[in-house]
Amino acid sequence: MSDKFVAIGDIHGCVLTVEKLLEDIVKQHKDRKFVFVGDYIDRGPDAKKTIDFLIEFSKSNSCIFLRGNHEQMLLDFQDGVSSIGSWQRNGGKETYLNYMNEKKKFELPYQHYHFFRNTRLFFDSAEFFFVHAGLDPECSIQESIINEQ
């Protein structure tokens, strides 16, 4: 028997919405694997709480977390690859403020950094291929993966 998946994307810091959605799904379907296809942060009000919730949810549910462009922008900023301007122009201001410490400095908890860093670029099951974005319609899936790496 093949796996049954629930794919969820573009939460964008809306933790209350995703909590309610997942509560309803879990009540009805106990045997699902959850594939979150990225964009957990930015634009919405509660990026930090969203990540806390997803980490906690994954402790009792089968979850696969993919990286969206918003997580990549946060990692690029955190790792010093790009400036904050690019990230904030693309909705990162709310997330930046969520992670500000009492000294008004950006502080990403290690557990959250680890979560972002360990997201996958894609997930390939026996029947489905999951990705946030970036596949070239002119190429096969294999060629697109090779080009991205």
Task: Map each language-model feature to its residues.
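Hydrophobic/aromatic beta-strand patches that form the interior of the parallel beta-sheet core
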Residues: 6, 35, 64-66, 129
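N-terminal active-site segment of His-dependent metallophosphoesterases
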Residues: 1-53
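Active-site neighborhood of divalent metal-dependent phosphoester bond hydrolases
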Residues: 43-126, 137, 149
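Catalytic core of the metallo-beta-lactamase
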Residues: 13-16, 124-126, 133
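Beta-strand-turn-beta hairpins that frame and shape the catalytic cleft
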Residues: 1-6, 123-129
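A short local structural element in Rossmann-fold oxidoreductases
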Residues: 19, 75, 140
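Histidine-centered divalent metal-coordination motifs
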Residues: 10-12, 69-70, 132
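Cytochrome P450 core scaffold surrounding the K-helix E-X-X-R motif
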Residues: 139-145
